Amino acid sequence: MSIPADLLYTDTHEWVRIEGDEAVIGITQFAQEQLGDLTFVDLPAVGDTLATGQEMGSVESVKAASELYSPLAGTVSAVNDALSGAPELVNQSPYTDGWMVRVKLSATPEGLLSAADYEAVVAREAH
């Protein structure tokens, strides 16, 4: 399983790419593999304000439904509208085409995991 070293992670299986004063968020390859084929993605609206740890949407698959949690605080500046018609993009390409939201940061993100630390989380949960 691929865990890109240039991203940050949460123990709830979201990934974060910091780009200046914004961050792009999605779910990890491990998360989408556990869920199976996604059938629906519910995302926040552009302009919504998110707090760290706040529920910001959900994903549904053939196997389960799962909430999405914001790993940081800020205002949603973009959502991946392609996912409403093609949720399978998350399965096919979780770190690129399957991104979910872009957030303008209101505070420096804290408590995010490095790729190595996230790999340890995945190893614990995979057993």
Curated annotation (Swiss-Prot):
Q: How is the cofactor bound?
A: Binds 1 lipoyl cofactor covalently.
Entry protein name = Glycine cleavage system H protein
Say which species the protein is native to: Nitratidesulfovibrio vulgaris (strain DSM 19637 / Miyazaki F)
Record-annotated Lipoyl-binding domain positions: 22-104
Q: Which Pfam families match?
A: GCV_H
- HAMAP family with a match to the protein in the record: GcvH
Kindly state which keywords UniProt assigns to this record, in alphabetical order: Lipoyl
Give the family per the record.
Answer: Belongs to the GcvH family.
Query: What cofactor is this protein dependent on?
Result: (R)-lipoate
Q: Its Gene Ontology biological processes?
A: glycine decarboxylation via glycine cleavage system
Q: Tell me the residues on which N6-lipoyllysine occurs.
A: 63
- Cited InterPro entries: 2-oxoA_DH_lipoyl-BS, Biotin_lipoyl, GCV_H, GCV_H/Fam206, GCV_H_sub, Single_hybrid_motif
* GO CC terms, sorted: cytosol; glycine cleavage complex
Q: Which NCBIfam families match?
A: gcvH, PRK01202.1
- Known role: The glycine cleavage system catalyzes the degradation of glycine. The H protein shuttles the methylamine group of glycine from the P protein to the T protein.
Subunit info? The glycine cleavage system is composed of four proteins: P, T, L and H.
